């Protein structure tokens, strides 16, 4: 299997589930003309996948994209500390959505799975000291929404409604269920 992603979290989730894969990243510009946020994220994941799949028609290719959305606005990876502070301040005390889209394809076997998983996360009310402490960990700067639920960022989270691993970057349970539906046995996932 080829993972079309540099995300350390996705790699960790897939390795922990027993998948063997190689990483080949695409160099597409992560933009989409789709108006609906979930369609836009799925479109970006598909573009990442297609760039790799067209040159690897006999391989399974997996691509994904994750965003944090608050009140219709996407919070990507912060450009600097000030933007990260603003993101976290805006998330403070509120419920936001984490949207992960993934596409799994094998051209020669005519296999295609397209999926979007939406989870909700509620943050505690965060004071400036807590936000600055978290920023000092350097954890938020390579993550959508400026936090990682699997690290120090977990202390910011009051509750979640949805898939923890999707919030982390890849909905492994959903993916495994989709593989079962198309006839792949979980005991053979290291062969995919």
Curated annotation (Swiss-Prot):
CDD domains: Maf
Catalytic activity: dTTP + H2O = dTMP + diphosphate + H(+); UTP + H2O = UMP + diphosphate + H(+)
GO CC annotations on file: cytoplasm
Co-factor requirement: a divalent metal cation
Residues annotated as catalytic: 65 (proton acceptor)
UniProt subcellular location: Cytoplasm
Site (Important for substrate specificity): 9, 66, 150
One Pfam family, short name: Maf
Superkingdom of origin: Bacteria
Signal peptide positions (record): none
Main location: cytoplasm
Assigned EC number: 3.6.1.9
Biological processes, Gene Ontology terms: nucleotide metabolic process
Keyword list, A-Z: Cytoplasm, Hydrolase, Nucleotide metabolism
Family: Belongs to the Maf family. YhdE subfamily.
Name of the protein in question: dTTP/UTP pyrophosphatase
